[in-house]
Amino acid sequence: MSTAPITDSPTSVAASELRRAPLLAAVDSLAELFESNGRQAELDRRLPQAVADAMREADLFWMKTPLELGGSELHPLHFADVMEQIAYHDISAAWATMIGNGTTGVMAGWLPEAGADDLFAGERPITAGQFTPRGVAVPADGGYRITGRWGFGSGIGHANWIVGAAFIEGTHDILFFTAPKSDATVYDVWHVAALQGTGSNDYSVDDLFVPEHRTMGAYGATSSRTGHCFRMPISIFISNEISPMAVGIAKRAIDDMVDLAKSTARSLTGVGDLIDRVPFQKAVGQA
């Protein structure tokens, strides 16, 4: 029996904390790139390729991917720390990163071994899509023939794989699947008032054969991965992804408000800048 301290385990919280450090440093180094491209992302209605490429180089799309497949396999709280920091600089970049991490993490963590091998066989996967069952999967020899159309494919512009969900024909059973993006049709429909840069377009597949090893049941799926993160249900695995982004943009709003208050005078009161007013200081403190 091993007597090594539990902190020496690659799946320990302490080990995850060590892997978090370079990711946070990478986000800091990309801060100017995020912020200088934010407006362009809104105009293009997708992340600029330069931003997506930089995040790829910084390994920011594989924070929830198992160690065995080259991912960071961060503890949920450490993943939240990184997501909060990205959102502080650019919420659209954070949203696309969140989707890529969650969908890749689910597929890498719960697909059969052969399916994960397919996913990681070539260029490292950046996945996009969602798991609402908007399709039908017809059983076929060795897999399923899937037809459906899904919305909110955030990050699909820079992705190379898609994920989706479908009801198995004639049942209420839900199937998750993944396929190369080249097998799907993408629809340019993302004309919205906010989060334009996420590029959350629709996508579809039509009678696409997906081998069984690239599918998994939505309920009761078990993972063969060794990390603690993959012992929890999929719904819990992805449940911490949105809240840290809300914290990040809230912190940015407070900081921007304080900066604005430093140069905003209240001439009617005879007081100088807004930053000097006690009610304002109290409100910032409460926030």
Kindly label every feature range from the protein language model.
Residues 125-127, 192-196:
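Short Gly/Pro-enriched turn/cap motifs at secondary-structure boundaries
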Residues 149-184, 188-189:
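DPxDG-like acidic metal-binding loop motif
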Residues 47-57, 62-159:
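Glycine-rich flavin
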Residues 134-136, 188-194, 202:
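Short Gly/Thr-rich strand-loop-strand
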Residues 126, 133-135, 142-144, 160-164, ...:
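Generic beta-strand structural signal
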Residues 2-65, 71-81, 244-287:
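Alpha-helical interface subdomain recognition
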Residues 144, 150-153, 164-168, 208, ...:
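Helix-rich catalytic cores of soluble enzyme domains
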Residues 193-194, 200-287:
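Glycine-rich beta->alpha junctions and the first turn(s) of the following alpha-helix
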